[in-house]
Structures are given as structure tokens and as C-alpha cells.
């Protein structure tokens, strides 16, 4: 398991279950010594923020929900490390805390642990915002998907064996909920 530091952020109490922009600014300043503007981003599980540092660099700040699985965080960290060593396309990189770790733990206002990670920012457009989606774009997506797949052939982690609801090969669960779609 990746080293996780218990930093000075343990003394900061988060105001609620969600993370405000002000709290995200404080978290990134205390744990990564980075100051700048913060923009809230959508996310499935983690609270995500784009950090635009005063030094001109952009980052992705990821703050877990309470009661996160440490194996899940370790999986994500090791996955990015593996891809950065084995993939020819640009992949976000794990950034180190001021303590030299790839993640740290903070406490929320109810005393629950949350994992914090900072990644390099990768510029690009969301697929949903691209218009028109043409043959060239589809070919590029397919090529990059193949590159990622090849790069992951030798990646092993116990957490990669779990079932994911949105995995198309595990989609039969929706059959009993089709009226909700």
C-alpha cells in the first residue's frame, strides 16, 4: 500500500459533507504549498477541483468521500504511475504532498477520514462538447483506447478484479430497473 501521511490538515475541520471552494484552496495550500484559484468539477465519486496556481500551472485536486476504500486509492495511484511509465500518450501524473507522499488523509467535521490527491492537469475537451464527431475523431479515440489497453496488459492490482456497475459486460443489473432509464 502506498504511504499515506497524516498531515497538518488533520487540524482543519471541513464544514460539511461536501467540499467548498474555500476548503479546497486551504487543502491544496497546506498539503501541496500551492496557491491559486479553484473551480469545482463534476465527479462520480470524488470531489474534484481544477486548481489554477499563481505560478501558471494547472492541477486536478481529488478529495474522497468519507469511508473510502484505501485499496481503491492505492489502485488509482499505481494505475497512473504504471501508465506514466508504459504509455506513449499524455496521462495525468500523481503529485507529491509537502511530506513527499502521493496522497494524504484529512478529517472532515465528523472526524471521518478523507483521502486527498493532486494530479497534473491534462488539457482537452469533453467528448460530449465536441461537434461534429467525425470519422477522424472516432479513429483517434479508437487508437488512443488501443494504446491505453496495450499499456495496461502487465498492470496487476487486487482492486482491478471488482465489478463496476457501468462496465458494459456487467450491465444485466439494469434489466430490473429499465423503467428508470
Identify the residue ranges that each predicted region occupies.
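Juxta-kinase regulatory segment immediately upstream of eukaryotic protein kinase catalytic domains
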Residues: 8-34
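A glycine-centered beta->alpha junction motif in the catalytic cores
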Residues: 100, 118-130, 176-180
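Active-site beta-strand termini and strand-to-loop segments that position acidic
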Residues: 51-54
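A cross-family kinase active-site recognition segment
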Residues: 131-181
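Glycine-rich ATP phosphate-binding loop
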Residues: 60
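ATP-binding glycine-rich phosphate-binding loop
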Residues: 33-49
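A conserved alpha-helical element in kinase catalytic cores
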Residues: 63-110, 130, 135-139
Amino acid at each position: 500500500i502506498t504511504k499515506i501521511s497524516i498531515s497538518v490538515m488533520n487540524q482543519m475541520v471541513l464544514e460539511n459533507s461536501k467540499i467548498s471552494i474555500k476548503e479546497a484552496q486551504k487543502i491544496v495550500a497546506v498539503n501541496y504549498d500551492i496557491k491559486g484559484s479553484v473551480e469545482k468539477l463534476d465527479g462520480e465519486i470524488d470531489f474534484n477541483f481544477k486548481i489554477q496556481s499563481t505560478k501558471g500551472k494547472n492541477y486536478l485536486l481529488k478529495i474522497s468521500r468519507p469511508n473510502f476504500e484505501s485499496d481503491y486509492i492505492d489502485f488509482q495511484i499505481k494505475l497512473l504511475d504504471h501508465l506514466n511509465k508504459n504509455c506513449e500518450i499524455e496521462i495525468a501524473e500523481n503529485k507529491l504532498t509537502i511530506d513527499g507522499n502521493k496522497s494524504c488523509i484529512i478529517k472532515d467535521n465528523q472526524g471521518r477520514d478523507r483521502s486527498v490527491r493532486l494530479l497534473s492537469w491534462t488539457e482537452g475537451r469533453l467528448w460530449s462538447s465536441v461537434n461534429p464527431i467525425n470519422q477522424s475523431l472516432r479513429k483517434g479515440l479508437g487508437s488512443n483506447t488501443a494504446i491505453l489497453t496495450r499499456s495496461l496488459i502487465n498492470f496487476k492490482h487486487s482492486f482491478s478484479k471488482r465489478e463496476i456497475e457501468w462496465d458494459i459486460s456487467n450491465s444485466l443489473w439494469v434489466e430490473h430497473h429499465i423503467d428508470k432509464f
